[in-house]
């Protein structure tokens, strides 16, 4: 008896029996346990009205053969019972009898009896093998897992793990999954058979085709004797009573291969080319499903149309443009540091040549101011003047006076206004203004004739330039300063052509000049400040 029973078991059931025998259970004990289980427990309360499974029709003596698993599930779940296979579930949540099982049990038609027998047969087989069969069927017909979840009420994560990895699932849940699978097979077969010979281009024919698809049948009743998974169950708010959502169109692998090959040839096909691709894709989808290409109108929601082909090509072009833009954005940041480094080197080189005089003047000149008597003394060598710096602009208008060239009045006014600016900008702009004056003085001092040298004169906060006559002398290399007699609001700074005391030839203003008051400035780079 045990040998005959093993021959009817699946590989998984044989492994379970082997594990029981390896645990120390003898054959006699196992057979006795099976005989004790033959009288069905009272809590199941199953009453078999007519034999539905082939084994029960043969009048087998085994308890498992005399009671169909499908009826056991519906009766056990209705009374809170639990089967031995339920412990294998990983989610552990309570799962009542799915509405799809109760609907199938309530039907007394011949087709419903065949479906129950088919579900019983699948429950007795290896769950992992059945799961792979269902997964292959869903891929063949482009059926999303969401549709299974909506009909059966299963958890989508648990369903995905069961189909992809063989994760254990409760028997009641597997029965709901198998019931959906059996009904879906018959439904798809009817879809291809009933619309055979109709013209897919006819809109009325297309409406008739869509009526057979549950996702387009908003009445909630499916065709055939199965009763439909979308039929209302009652006022209990079961998942089967809610309205089915329409499945989104999903490109099959056969159609995608055709479209990608066409995209390599032509990225923007014409309308005629798109219509040819429609026929080719529908033919490939029919071959994938194992039906004749003449039944392409039975694809329903998976039917390829010219609009869908147009949208597919448009989306591919957008994706390609986006990838190109992304590649450029990724490449550009690597080039920016190189460009900025090159620009900084060029800017540094030009700045070094333009500001060479300003940098030298800043290192040689020390400026100082006083609140009551602002005074600045600077010592600049005429040889250090560079005519290429930016301060000597050729656009500036100069005022010609006897013996030299003076800057315009606006420049002198700017010197006074710059002295009132902030301390941060004061030093920089003051150097620019005085550098301009120094350059003019150098041009005057390098003349071989007797020149009129401009002298900075600050009177009551107003800065002016006065021409002063100097006799002809040798090369001028030093800068001297002198102050005149004690005047309360005036002090003059002039540039001497020699290191020794200068001889002034201006009788009107400097007749009382005492040569002893002229101080000698050495060759050091420091600039003395005299204030009184």
Curated annotation (Swiss-Prot):
Segments of the chain annotated as binding DNA: 244-324
GO-annotated cellular components: nucleus
Alphabetic keyword roster: Activator, Developmental protein, DNA-binding, Homeobox, Nucleus, Transcription, Transcription regulation
GO biological process: anterior/posterior pattern specification involved in pronephros development; insulin secretion; liver development; pancreas development; positive regulation of DNA-templated transcription; regulation of transcription by RNA polymerase II
Gly residues bias (residue ranges): 222-231
Tissue/organ expression: First expressed at stage 10 in the intermediate mesoderm. Expressed in rhombomere r5 by 14 hpf with expression diminishing by 18 hpf.
Recorded superkingdom: Eukaryota
InterPro entries, per database record: HD (IPR001356), HNF-1 (IPR039066), HNF-1_N (IPR006899), HNF-1_POU (IPR044869), HNF1_dimer_N_dom_sf (IPR023219), HNF1b_C (IPR006897), HNF_P1 (IPR044866), Homeodomain-like_sf (IPR009057)
Region described as Disordered: spans on this chain: 74-95, 222-245, 500-532
Main location: nucleus
HNF-p1 domain residues: 5-36
Compartments, record wording: Nucleus
Gene Ontology molecular function: DNA-binding transcription factor activity, RNA polymerase II-specific; RNA polymerase II cis-regulatory region sequence-specific DNA binding
Database matches in CDD domains: homeodomain
SMART domains per UniProt: HOX
Record's compositionally biased regions (Polar residues): 505-532
Family note: Belongs to the HNF1 homeobox family.
Subunit structure: Binds DNA as a dimer. Can form homodimer or heterodimer with HNF1-alpha.
Biological role stated in the UniProt entry: Transcription factor that binds to the inverted palindrome 5'-GTTAATNATTAAC-3'. Acts downstream of hnf1ba but is not required for induction of rhombomere r5/r6 gene expression in the hindbrain.
Protein name (record): Hepatocyte nuclear factor 1-beta-B
Species of origin: Danio rerio (Zebrafish)
Upper classification of the organism: Eukaryota, Metazoa, Chordata, Craniata, Vertebrata
Gene: hnf1bb
């Amino acid at each position: 008896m045990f040998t005959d029973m093993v021959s009817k078991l699946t590989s998984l059931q044989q492994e379970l029996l082997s594990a029981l025998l390896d645990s120390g259970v003898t054959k006699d004990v196992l057979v006795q346990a099976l005989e004790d289980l033959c009288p069905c427990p009272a809590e199941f309360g199953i009453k078999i009205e007519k034999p539905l499974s082939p084994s029960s029709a043969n009048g087998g003596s085994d308890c498992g053969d005399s009671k169909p698993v499908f009826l056991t599930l519906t009766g056990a779940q209705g009374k809170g019972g639990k089967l031995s296979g339920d412990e294998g579930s990983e989610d552990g949540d309570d799962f009542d009898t799915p509405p799809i099982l109760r609907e199938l049990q309530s039907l007394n038609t011949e087709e419903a009896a065949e479906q129950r027998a088919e579900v019983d047969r699948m429950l007795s087989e290896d769950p992992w093998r059945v799961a792979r069969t269902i997964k292959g069927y869903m891929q063949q017909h482009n059926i999303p897992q969401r549709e299974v979840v909506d009909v059966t009420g299963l958890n989508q994560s648990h369903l995905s793990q069961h189909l992809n990895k063989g994760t254990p699932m409760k028997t009641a849940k597997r029965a709901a999954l198998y019931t959906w699978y059996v009904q879906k097979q018959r439904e798809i077969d009817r879809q291809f058979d009933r619309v055979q010979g109709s013209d897919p281009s006819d809109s009325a024919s297309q409406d008739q085709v869509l009526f057979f698809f549950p996702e387009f049948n908003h009445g909630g009743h499916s065709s055939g004797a199965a009763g439909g998974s979308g039929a209302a169950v009652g006022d209990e708010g079961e998942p089967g009573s809610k309205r089915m959502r329409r499945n989104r169109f999903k490109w099959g692998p056969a159609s995608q291969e055709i479209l990608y090959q066409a995209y390599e040839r032509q990225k923007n096909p014409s309308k005629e080319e798109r219509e040819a691709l429609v026929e080719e894709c529908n033919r490939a989808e029919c071959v994938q499903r194992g039906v004749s290409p003449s039944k392409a109108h039975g694809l329903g929601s998976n039917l390829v149309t010219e609009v869908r082909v147009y949208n597919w090509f448009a989306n591919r072009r957008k994706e390609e443009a986006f990838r190109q833009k992304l590649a450029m954005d990724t490449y550009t940041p690597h080039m920016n540091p190189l460009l900025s480094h090159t620009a900084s080197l060029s800017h540094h080189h030009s700045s070094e040549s333009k500001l060479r005089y300003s940098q030298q003047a800043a290192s040689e000149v020390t400026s100082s101011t006083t609140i009551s008597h602002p005074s600045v003394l600077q010592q600049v060598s005429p040889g250090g003047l560079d005519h290429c710096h930016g301060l000597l602009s050729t656009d500036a208008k100069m005022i010609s006076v006897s013996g030299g060239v003076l800057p315009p009045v606006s420049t002198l006014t700017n010197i006074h206004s710059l002295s009132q600016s902030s301390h941060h900008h004061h030093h920089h702009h003051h150097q620019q203004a005085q550098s301009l004056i120094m350059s003019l003085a150098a041009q005057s001092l390098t003349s071989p004739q007797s020149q009129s040298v401009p002298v900075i004169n600050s009177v009551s906060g107003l800065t002016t330039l006065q021409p002063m006559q100097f006799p002809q002398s040798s090369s001028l290399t030093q800068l001297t300063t002198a102050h005149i007699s004690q005047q309360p609001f005036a002090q003059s700074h002039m540039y001497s052509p020699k290191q020794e005391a200068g001889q002034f030839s201006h009788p009107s203003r400097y007749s009382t000049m005492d040569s002893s008051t002229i101080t000698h400035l050495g060759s050091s780079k420091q600039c003395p400040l005299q204030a009184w």
